[in-house]
Amino acid sequence: MIPRRSLLPMLVASLAGLSRFSVGADLQQFPTSELTIVSASGSHRFKVELAKTPAQMTQGLMFRTSLAPDAGMLFEYQQPTAATMWMRNTLIPLDMLFVDAQGRIVNIHERAVPQSLDVIGAAEPVRAVIELNGGTAARLGIEPGDRVIHPIFGNTS
């Protein structure tokens, strides 16, 4: 058992660590790009923020309270990798689309639960993960096998 007196300094230190994110001092800036997802229901354009650096990937969409309907984040890996995600400090539900090196969606995890520490991944290596508002994939009919058009996949047409 930890004495109550020792809990106060730990609590203050923990809150101090969290507060640096709330003031934006250490929050990453993200470049933006557009991508298109081609599905049986049509072509769907999104303006995405690009997470390329380890710091950007670590932060992702943490601490956001909303996301525009046509917005998202693209996590770009230099080589196909067994990417795993979680929802720590993420305040909104997200759909996670796992995309192979050819731009094909290989797995979709729909409506990931905010703040969950469950590990989410794909069964095969991916070149990218796209995070969209929770429910977007179902609403637009986006499914595994659909194509993502973006320069990182070499298929901009």
Language model features with spans:
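N-terminal export signals
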Residues: 6-24
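Positively charged n-region of N-terminal signal peptides that target proteins for export
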Residues: 1-5
